[in-house]
Curated annotation (Swiss-Prot):
Top EC class, one word: isomerase
Annotated source species: Arabidopsis thaliana
GO cellular component, one term: Golgi apparatus
Entry annotated with the keyword Phosphoprotein: no
UniProt-recorded name of the protein: UDP-arabinopyranose mutase 3
Sugar attachment sites: R154
Encoding gene, per UniProt annotation: RGP3
Amino acid sequence: MAQLYSSVKPTPMLKDELDIVIPTIRNLDFLEMWRPFFEQYHLIIVQDGDPSKVINIPVGFDYELYNRNDINRILGPKASCISFKDSACRCFGYMVSKKKYIYTIDDDCFVAKDPTGKEINALEQHIKNLLSPSTPHFFNTLYDPYRDGADFVRGYPFSMREGAITAVSHGLWLNIPDYDAPTQLVKPLEKNSRYVDAVMTIPKGTLFPMCGMNLAFDRELIGPAMYFGLMGDGQPIGRYDDMWAGWCVKVICDHMGWGVKTGLPYIWHSKASNPFVNLKKEYNGIFWQEEAIPFFQSVTLPKECTSVQQCYLELAKLVREKLGKVDPYFITLATGMVTWIEAWEELNSAEGTEAEAPKGKN
């Protein structure tokens, strides 16, 4: 595992244009090992669970801390779209941010090391991924052609070499892999030690299981679609929040002509969650995903949808019409999707209400 404190302080990229969003139910001691990489950035911490519990944050970080009472105060009746007792609550941080970019990480994710033993600056790599183009329309067999030491291979169309705007950078994990509960149960001791030094664009028309524990995106571009759904307390499903967002985001990025990257950077995922608890959360989703994925694979958004908000509302309508037949939960989820967009517009319009930082600065 990585040492507790890195000795190297890098020059921060985009420090005034990026927020780090962290959902948590516990003290954030893990930030100490990220201090050299995160200290000069602004943090948005979304406290899940009991709002009366005091969350301790190491001294020296610039942050806002929101709990459920703050979410209810800021959103009023629209707070119903934000999940409770589930890490899906992190998307509230996306909504109240005023920055162009978001990086979100879980509180059990530590600094990883590459095969040479060098600590990985995950945030820096995500930023590089977002600032360079993607290649969603034609696959380059050398993966990222914009990376140092790589280029487009023979046969790659010259007309496509400018690439597409990158909307999402999806990072990976060493140590504990992001498995579903059935896989956890049959492979309880499995660890991921395989470091693949590659970044690739997920091709247009291909879905992927997005994981929210090491994820960056262009908030101004795709933020309104980064809704992590209704999960956790009072809902018949959990642990599908990030994947639901990923399916929606990928369909919209394909429609808008934007790219989604996956691969580097790696973080060290420190602990496995309980597979029996996970199975209870995932049980319905294991069956529902067999209906949901074909739905997203077949969705075609009308050309009249020219903004992310329009695309997302169209998706919400289709979710209600098509997936509502699978289970009434999807009708509730579609309502949440619409409420999310209404709340996003309310907080992010030119005349929108400012979400006051409830705990000030540290």
